[in-house]
Amino acid sequence: MNRKYRKTVIAGNWKMNMLASEIKPFMEELKENLPKTRTCEMVLCTPAVMIPAMVKAGKDCKVAAGGQDVSKYEKGAYTGEVSASQLADIGAKYCIVGHSERRQYHGEDDMLINAKAKALLEKGIMPIICVGESLEQREMDLTMEYVAYQVKAALSGIDASQLRRCVIAYEPIWAIGTGKTATAEQAQEVCEGIRAVIRGIYGARPARAVSILYCGSMNAKNAQELLAQPDIDGGLIGGASLKPVDFATIVKATDQD
């Protein structure tokens, strides 16, 4: 993995799992299994109500706290929403936007995802912007056409200085929560394509510096092969991030230089 120009990020997405009371024992077990030295940045994205507990428990392991979604609005009469300033106030350093589950179950479109990413950047939170194709789109050979459109839409109006604080996560929708995984070659091909799209917008240097993660059933068994690919700079981990030993194993897999 080439770490010369960009950081490696291993981020967990706990989705609607775990309790705040379970975070401390989780972190204690994680610490026991982590390597003494590591070059990657670790993030755990929890439901918003659990972020303060993650901030507190994560300090010892140097795990950053992240959110799973954010409102495009700064404040107001938006019942149930959480703003970027509220996330920042409780210690979130990262936040996922555009996850396929948000797109599917909540009807989120690219314009909304772009607005959310901008809201996060304004408050100093790094957005993890998810893009990816369905099985139908892959079978129709439309993967890069669709993913390129998502990338361009998500980054619309974001300048090169802001791009440096963005992370892109490629999530083949057909591999989310299904146990199916894109081959390392398939994942690399799309991540390389994403970097090419960014290069076309911002130029070679900014594109070279963007961290691109793979999000599609990465686990302790396949992480090393996926993370060895030149354009995969980490992972956005679902189920495996709920298991301290497995998450630590994925972190160890980043040390391949």
Model-derived features with residue positions:
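Active-site loop-to-helix "anion-binding N-cap" substructures in soluble metabolic enzymes
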Residues: 1-257
